Amino acid sequence: TPKKKLLIDAGLAGKKITGLLAEIDRKPEDLDAILITHEHSDHIHGVGVLARKYGMDLYANEATWKAMEGTKYLGKVDDAQKHIFEMGKTKTFGDIDIESFGVSHDAAAPQFYRFMKDGKSFVMLTDTGYVSDRLAGIVADADGYLIESNHDVEILRAGSYAWRLKQRILSDLGHLSNEDGADAMIRTLGNRTKKIYLGHLSKENNIKELAHMTMENQLARADLAVGHDFEVLDTSPDTATPLTKI
């Protein structure tokens, strides 16, 4: 927003994140804070580097802080930059209110966020094995979503991952498949929803076009008018997603 610039997680190297920000004419020194969802390396790889270099504040819940302490990704960060954002709470950052909510993932206390400003909201929801009815209610009827479409089940099962890792991904503490993500959207989107971004796609176990097609097809079968009432949009860890207004 005009008053606050926030980064959710920093799962890439600091140099890579700096380059991606430049693609949308932003600089890391403009960021006020990083909100951390959980301690897995693909979400905190660049957290420590960015915090030390640019002095930005870091927010996570207490259990996640404990899980991050001592990791090479966090390293030594000034205590004044460390802040608690407990699960199930709402914090105000300048002109935006942010609600945290828990998800089902194999981390200490994973949480994601709903961003609210001027009567509109945007939900980020990835890294969860399933979406419960309670969670669906918490994130319902947002103006926009970033929803996980992590894997295609058949590609994952036929792929080279160890069976134990496949079981983890497919479990209730794993990740949403393309079908799971579409089902979650069918249960949560509302009349105000205009944009659905597909995120956290596995490079090994998914294909961008397949994820997109699965989402659109399942929404269409549920009589939801893709392209008329709302649009489905792709994201990639290799390129910056264009800025958009919600």
Name each model-derived stretch:
Residues L7-G11, D32-E39, Y59-E62, V123-D127, ...:
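Active-site neighborhood of phospho(di)ester-bond hydrolases with catalytic His/Asp-centered motifs
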Residues E62-F112, M116-G119:
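Metallo-beta-lactamase
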